[in-house]
Amino acid sequence: MRYSQYFIPTVKETPSDAEVISHKLMLRAGMIRKLAAGIYNYLPFGLRSIRKVEAIVREEMNRAGAIELLMPAVQPAELWKESGRWEFYGKELLRFNDRKDAEFCMGPTHEEVITDLIRKEVRSYRQLPINLYQIQGKFRDEIRPRFGLMRGREFIMKDAYSFDVNEAGADVSYEKMYKAYRRIFERCGLKFRAVEADTGTIGGNYSHEFMVLADSGEDAIVSCSACEYAANMEKAETRKGEGIEHADPRPMEHVSTPGQKSIEDVAAFLGVQNTQVVKTLVLVADGEPVVALIRGDYDLNEIKLKNHLGCAELEMAEDDVVVKVTGAPTGYAGPVGLAAKVKVVADLSLEGMHNFVTGANAADTHLKNVNIGRDFSVSGFVDIRNVVIGDACPRCDSGKLEIWRGIEVGHVFKLGTKYSKALKATFLDADGKEQTIFMGCYGIGVGRTVAACIEQNHDENGIIFPIPIAPFQCIISSLSVKEDEVKAASESIYQELLEAGIEVLLDDRDERPGFKFKDADLIGIPLRIVVGAKALAEGKVELKERRSGEVEVLPIAEAIAKVKAAVKEALQV
């Protein structure tokens, strides 16, 4: 491809609305352009990288025995109502009515559609197992689309669905996909980790996320210092801790705390540690208020609480709800003498804790020496907090938990019979008895994988693409396009590389060398051959590796051979 005939609209200045480095560089390198919030045009240069990831995904899916199909982006509401997700999925599901007033949605995922297909076509155990996948555009109406392709509303996704006769078969399918995902991300040149994860709106029994390690990652990843335990923050488990205060219960007393609302302020005012203060949080679960109690130095994990309650929607209560439940303004809520009868859930950190401080459900007032059981009751002690660095590992006795940042690029789910039961997807077994199909589903964010790669592979000059997903593998910077010798040599090298199957971009623009070098660094093509009059007079060219910055002046044939060898090595499967 000749640069002068290609479309790579690079820009020198960083766009003001771009926050993370991948968003900034994808805009500057002419890979994407914003159309609307969370919706992007994939420009030719960016699309080449997208297609590289898709090709790797297809090869590994096919190798694992999955079969490609394509399903509609528009889905009828009745399928989602049948599965129970029409209301559960929430506002991220973009719903609309057609001209006949029939309800539809733009598919953010395809569990209902694929299950409907299978229930109509599969009759016998002889037709199972089967694994079907597609690579297709999805739409999720994110409340805060941001970070470019990291959290868009419209995105490209590979989703696969496995169907088995029993749980043992489903486990085999899950393991095949797990291994295929590891191969995919290894081939893309990514540093990643597979971690236990919450199943979220997809549901099911068990899941793993594949997280690309990056300081800019939205997600927190938890791992053990001594064993293989790893999970995302939503899923990471805590152990029951020791009670902070073991003294016998003391008489509860009201104390005046004028203007003291935060945990830190209250603790300092009363001369106690944050660990001796209990937060009383009022939330609304499916329209009903609920109270969560947690130690003052910890943060509530809303996903854990939501899963415990089994609700579809969970959010912090507005001030008027807090007043209705507690009888006091926000900042002074406590579990003793609540104005309304609500469910009270306590974190494990409170089990065995005595003589702690809480709000008194009255303005400018707190309670000291509060004790569970004597002063109020809870529905149970549940793990509803975020882990912190140094927590004991829930799986081994010696390890401590560490926290990293990561970007989710893939997710595998063991669904069990969640969708097949709801949609009545069954088969006849060898004895002629009707059985429910066991399912799994497996997703990869294709555009997000490219963005995550850039987050992990860049420097101050621009992108550093790994060869397997680089839009081009080599760029030829022809420095003096008006000099016949330079032009001819550049053309000869270009043709030889093309004939060898190398994806090469010939920069034949009539621009200054520095301008071309800056563009080459920005767009991140892994290998660069520089053809200039001075070196060419000796039959040589300059070969530069983008990642290491290493520069060699070599005979033309040797430079070409090195490019071929580097590409061949990088693409070995």
Swiss-Prot record:
Q: What InterPro entries does this protein's entry cite? A: aa-tRNA-synt_IIb, aa-tRNA-synth_II, aa-tRNA-synth_II/BPL/LPL, Anticodon-bd, Anticodon-bd_dom_sf, Pro-tRNA-ligase_IIa, Pro-tRNA-synth_IIa_bac-type, Pro-tRNA-Synthase_IIa_type1
User: Among the record's GO biological process terms, what is one?
Assistant: prolyl-tRNA aminoacylation
Principal cellular location given in the protein's record: cytoplasm
Q: Which residues cross the membrane?
A: none
Q: Which UniProt keywords apply?
A: Aminoacyl-tRNA synthetase, ATP-binding, Cytoplasm, Ligase, Nucleotide-binding, Protein biosynthesis
Tell me its EC number(s), please: 6.1.1.15
Q: Known SUPFAM superfamilies for this protein?
A: Class II aaRS ABD-related, Class II aaRS and biotin synthetases, YbaK/ProRS associated domain
The UniProt entry, under HAMAP family, shows: Pro_tRNA_synth_type1 (MF_01569)
Q: Which family does it belong to?
A: Belongs to the class-II aminoacyl-tRNA synthetase family. ProS type 1 subfamily.
Name listed for the protein in its UniProt record = Proline--tRNA ligase
